[in-house]
Curated annotation (Swiss-Prot):
This is Small heat shock protein hspG12. InterPro entries: A-crystallin/Hsp20_dom, HSP20-like_chaperone, HspG1-11-like. It comes from the Eukaryota. Gene3D superfamilies: 2.60.40.790. Coiled coil: none annotated. PROSITE patterns: SHSP. SUPFAM superfamilies: HSP20-like chaperones (SSF49764). It holds the Pfam family HSP20. Residues 134-147 have a biased composition (Basic and acidic residues). Belongs to the small heat shock protein (HSP20) family. The keyword tRNA processing does not apply. It comes from Dictyostelium discoideum. The lineage of its organism: Eukaryota, Amoebozoa, Evosea, Eumycetozoa, Dictyostelia.
Length: 205
C-alpha cells in the first residue's frame, strides 16, 4: 500500500520531468529562432560594492573591435566573435609560394654566359626547358612547408553572455558606465546612485 510520501515523491518526479522536457523544448526553439550559433561562453565575475557594480569577463585572444556591449530591457549583453589568427597563415603562404633569392639568381641567364658554340637547335631547347620545368616543380614541392597540428585545444567562433540587472537596476546610474579592456579582461563598472530606493510613493490627487 502506497503511503502519502510515495505519492508526493511520484508527483515531484513527474513535475521535474515535465519541467525538464519543457526546458529542452524551449532550448530547441531558441536555437531554431536564433541565427547565430554560440560557440564560446566566456567566464564572468560580478561584484557589488558599496558604491559600484563591477562586471569582469575573460575574453582572451579577442580584439577590442570584435566586442559589442549593450543593455536592453534591463539585460546586459556582451557578444562578439573570436577570430583565428590570420597572420600565421599569411606567413606560411608567403614562405611556401615565394622562391628563394639564390634560385632566382641561378635561373637568370646573363649575356656573358652564352657563346656562339652554345647555340643549339630548337628541338633540343624545348626538351631542355621541359626537363628544367619538371625539376623546378619537384624543387617547389620539396620546399613547400607543411603544417601538422599535434594539439588543438583553442576554440573560435561567436560568443555571448547575458546578465540580468532587474534586481538591482534601481540602484545603478546607467549614465556612469565605464568600460576597460586590458590583457584579455573586459571590466564594466557601473556606479550606484547617491540616493536610491526600491519603493515609489504615489500621491492621490
Amino acid at each position: 500500500m502506497a503511503t502519502i510520501f510515495d505519492i508526493l515523491n511520484t508527483l515531484n518526479n513527474n513535475n521535474n520531468n515535465k519541467n525538464y522536457f519543457e526546458s529542452c523544448k524551449r532550448q530547441r526553439t531558441n536555437n531554431k529562432t536564433n541565427k547565430t550559433i554560440i560557440d564560446i561562453l566566456p567566464p564572468m565575475d560580478v561584484t557589488m560594492t558599496n558604491d559600484k557594480l563591477i562586471i569582469e569577463t575573460e575574453l582572451a585572444g579577442i580584439s577590442k573591435d570584435d566586442i559589442e556591449i549593450s543593455i536592453n530591457d534591463s539585460i546586459l549583453t556582451i557578444q562578439g566573435e573570436k577570430k583565428k589568427n590570420l597572420n600565421k597563415q599569411l606567413i606560411i603562404e608567403k614562405s611556401s609560394s615565394s622562391p628563394s633569392l639564390l634560385d632566382t639568381k641561378e635561373d637568370e641567364a646573363s649575356i656573358e654566359e652564352f657563346d656562339e658554340d652554345d647555340i643549339k637547335p630548337k628541338s633540343t631547347e624545348t626538351t631542355s626547358t621541359l626537363s628544367n620545368s619538371k625539376e623546378n616543380k619537384k624543387d617547389e614541392n620539396k620546399s613547400k612547408s607543411t603544417e601538422k597540428k599535434f594539439i588543438s585545444e583553442r576554440s573560435f567562433g561567436n560568443f555571448k553572455r547575458y546578465l540580468d540587472l532587474t534586481k538591482f537596476l534601481y540602484q545603478l546610474d546607467l549614465n556612469s558606465i565605464n568600460t576597460q579592456f586590458e590583457n584579455g579582461l573586459l571590466t564594466i563598472t557601473i556606479n550606484k546612485k547617491l540616493h536610491y530606493s526600491n519603493t515609489i510613493k504615489i500621491n492621490i490627487n
